[in-house]
């Protein structure tokens, strides 16, 4: 079976990250993106260097791209400019933002100095550039992951900025199309982490009601956090945790033409780990849709996954999205440590087109292409064997607070075979012997419910609001309490030698609403 990296979507393009920065459909139907030429070693290159922004156009829906055309040269050759993101507003103006770094010594990762660089053009063609250092928020910034234009026409741009020990989040906004900018209060998140990437990092925002915005924040606390603004981004509430698991990675929000909100994020926990509580489980990207202003979501399905040949520590991360049509969106993300050889110095970017309708589905059957495993996968199922210290296979299904799963399993059950139900992706790295006891388990515990079948056969797993029941060949053998409100992943694993064949899979959600914990 051919491995598919992108699920429920059509891959349009792949290119170097610096050659394809987000994607948007122009009013004439063509696709537009930006590319950048920066310093060869980024923020660590102290020598003067010319740095440029170029535009690119696709006439064939992203399959091929025309030669880049010049848009702008950044003003200071000593500063390092990293293109962060851009937006074309309703009047056609192009707004471009960059991270302008003036000092980032190798020997002091917490000495980060710089500011936000901004340039506005009359259109994507680059007329009449207007440059600003955004004096209202003159601090070093990290990544930019979305930009919105509110119903009233205000531009709101979420940033996290460095405050000496970690990051705080906030927004800048403009009511005059980018001529001038103001900044909100800072939103902070406290943790015991000592990494410079802790705090309230890389926020994204969405307008959930006229003038009411919700901010989602990357943290090291195994959850996305959120804050609310009731004045279109001028001020923000204190941050609180959501119910959505997340490794230390940013999310993305996009309001669809019908008013629903699309959420994309790394719904993963655990290894690879760094520092005290720093999960980099970015192997898979997930998507969900909300019809009630992010109070609840549906779906929580994998849309980008780890494939055979990728490193276990692969990053499929940093999603950004824009509307392509009434029914489809453009989704961009980058990859690090993939089988193509991508790395932090050679990020691989991808642009796909996706119809979010599948996120409203409530059941899946025999979705073998969506399973993640080193074992053999065919159109008839999974042949699960111990490969590289563990037999491990995991798949994703529509989130269910109440639901059921049926599996047809054949073979002699290896000793210690387990079924894990979770509301997050759990990579095989979490279960190999050297990682089973470590900082991750000490900090977060076991983010799953473990079931123990006593034989191969017809496995039936049912759960309601409080408990889970496991039956084998019609006989109930285990009942236990849920440790999370619902599930959207199932893992089958064992450590001993042996072989199991999974020949049928059927998951059904009876209560598909995932309460995010967001309140306003």
What are these regions (language model features)?
Residues 1-363, 374-375, 493:
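Asp-box/BNR beta-propeller blade signature and adjacent active/binding-site loops
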Residues 440-458:
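Short, aromatic/His-centered strand-loop micro-motif at the edge of beta-sheets
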Residues 385-442:
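Secretory/extracellular carbohydrate-interaction modules
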Residues 480-506:
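Flexible glycan-contacting loops in extracellular carbohydrate-active proteins
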Residues 407-409, 455-472:
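Short tryptophan-centered beta-strand motifs in secreted/extracellular beta-sheet-rich domains
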Residues 73, 84, 240, 392-398, ...:
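Beta-strand-rich interaction surfaces with strong enrichment in secreted/lumenal proteins
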Residues 507-520:
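Extended recognition patches within non-cytosolic domains
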Residues 354-401:
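Low-complexity, Ser/Thr/Pro/Gly-rich disordered linker/stalk regions
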């Amino acid at each position: 079976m051919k491995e598919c990296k992108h699920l429920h979507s059509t891959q349009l393009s792949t290119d170097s990250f610096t050659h394809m920065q987000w994607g948007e459909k122009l009013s004439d139907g063509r696709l537009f993106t930006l590319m950048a030429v920066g310093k060869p070693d980024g923020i660590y290159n102290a020598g003067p260097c010319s740095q440029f922004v170029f535009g690119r156009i696709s006439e064939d829906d992203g399959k091929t791209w025309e030669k880049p055309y010049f848009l702008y040269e950044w003003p200071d050759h000593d500063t390092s400019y990293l293109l962060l993101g851009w937006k074309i507003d309703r009047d056609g103006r192009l707004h471009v933002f960059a991270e302008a770094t003036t000092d980032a010594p190798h020997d002091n990762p917490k000495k980060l100095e710089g500011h936000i660089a901004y340039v506005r053009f009359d259109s994507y063609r680059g007329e009449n550039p207007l440059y600003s250092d955004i004096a209202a928020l003159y601090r070093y910034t990290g990544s930019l992951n979305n930009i919105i234009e509110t119903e009233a026409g205000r531009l709101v741009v979420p940033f996290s900025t460095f405050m000496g020990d970690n990051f705080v989040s906030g927004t800048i906004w403009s009511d005059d199309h980018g001529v001038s900018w103001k900044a909100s209060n800072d939103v902070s998140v406290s943790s015991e982490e000592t990494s410079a990437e802790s705090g309230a990092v890389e926020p994204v925002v969405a307008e959930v009601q006229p003038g009411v915005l919700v901010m989602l924040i990357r943290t090291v606390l195994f959850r996305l956090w959120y804050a609310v603004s009731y004045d279109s981004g001028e001020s923000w509430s204190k941050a609180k945790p959501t119910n959505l698991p997340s490794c230390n990675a940013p999310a993305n929000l996009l309001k669809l033409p019908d008013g629903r909100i699309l959420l994309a994020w790394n719904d993963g926990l655990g290894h690879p780990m760094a520092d005290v509580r720093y999960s980099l489980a970015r192997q898979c990207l997930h998507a969900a849709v909300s019809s009630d202003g992010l109070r609840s979501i549906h779906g929580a399905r994998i849309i980008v996954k780890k494939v055979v040949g990728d490193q276990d520590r692969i990053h499929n991360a940093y999603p950004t999205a824009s509307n392509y049509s009434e029914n489809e969106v453009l989704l961009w993300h980058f990859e690090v440590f993939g089988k193509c050889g991508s790395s932090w110095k050679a990020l691989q970017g991808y642009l796909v087109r996706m119809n979010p309708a599948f996120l409203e589905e409530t059941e899946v059957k025999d979705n073998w292409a969506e399973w993640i495993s080193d074992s053999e996968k065919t159109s008839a199922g999974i042949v699960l064997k111990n490969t590289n210290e563990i037999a491990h296979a995991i798949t994703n299904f529509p989130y269910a607070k109440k639901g059921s799963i049926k599996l047809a399993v054949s073979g002699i059950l290896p000793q210690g075979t387990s079924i894990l139900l979770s509301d997050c992706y759990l990579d095989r790295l979490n279960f190999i012997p050297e990682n089973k006891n470590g900082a991750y388990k000490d900090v977060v515990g076991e983010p799953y419910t473990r079931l123990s079948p006593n034989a191969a056969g017809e496995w039936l797993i049912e759960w309601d609001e409080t408990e889970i029941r496991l039956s084998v060949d019609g006989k109930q053998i285990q009942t236990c309490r849920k440790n999370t409100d619902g599930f959207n992943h199932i893992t089958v694993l064992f450590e001993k030698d042996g072989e199991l064949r999974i020949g049928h899979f059927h998951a059904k959600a009876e209560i598909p609403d995932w309460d995010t914990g967001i309140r306003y």
